[in-house]
C-alpha cells in the first residue's frame, strides 16, 4: 500500500511538473545533434529527486548528507536545463556534492589518494550517464535494470542500504518510464534527470562496494561504461573536441543511421546489461575475471560494430 501511494503521488508530481514546464517553456528543441525530431518537454527526470526526497521524508531523515548532495546536483542541473551554466560553476556544485556523499560513505577515514581516485571515478560515471541520455527509454530502462539488480543483491547477497530507499527510487523511475519509454516521449529526462539518477545509483553502488570491499561490482555499469569510454577514445582518434555535442555513441548510430526504433535500442541495452548482471552474480567468486571478460567482450562488439556501420554516420 505504501509503494502504491508513493507511485500515485510521484505520478501526480510529474503531471504537475509538466504544467510548469509547459508554462515556463522548459522544452527540448531538436537540432542536428539530436536523435528526436519534435519539441518535447525537458526535465521530467526531476521525478528521480522527488523519489529520493520522498524516502528521506518518510524514513526519519535517513542519509541526510547524501540528500543534501543530491539536492545540490539536482539544483544546478535543473538550472542548466533552463539556462546554460558555466563549466566551473557546475564543477563546483558537483565536487561539493561528491564531498558530502563521500562523508556519508565514511570515505574520509581512508587515505587521501583513495578520495582522489573516487572523485575521478565518480565524476566520470556522472558525465558518462549524462552523455548516454540521448534516446527515448534508455535512461529510465537502464536505470531500472540496475535498481532491480541492487534490490536483489541487497536482499539476497548482502545488505548495504535500507531496502525502502531502492524501492522508492524504483517507483520514480517507473513513473518516468511511463512518459518516456515510448515512441513519442511525453518528456525527456534532461540534465536534471540523467545527473540525479546517476548520483543516486553512484551512492548505492558505492555503498555496495564499500560494504563488500569488492570493486568488481562496477560491472553493474559496464554497458554504459564501455560505450562511453570507447566513444571518447574514438573521438580523440578523430581529433575532435570531446567537450562538444555529437552523435557517435553506438546507441546513437543504431537509432539515427540504422533507423532502429529508440525503444528497441533501449531494450537491447537493458537486455545486455541484465545478462551481464545475472552472469556476474552467478559467477561472483570470479568477480574481477568476469568484469575484465565483460569489458573485453563489449569492447570487441563496439569495435566490430563501428567498423561495419560508422561509415554511415553523418557528422
Predicted regions and their residues:
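"…together with the soluble PPM/PP2C metallo-phosphatase catalytic core" -> "…together
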Residues: 1-229
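C-terminal membrane-associated helical module and adjoining short loops/tails
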Residues: 210-315
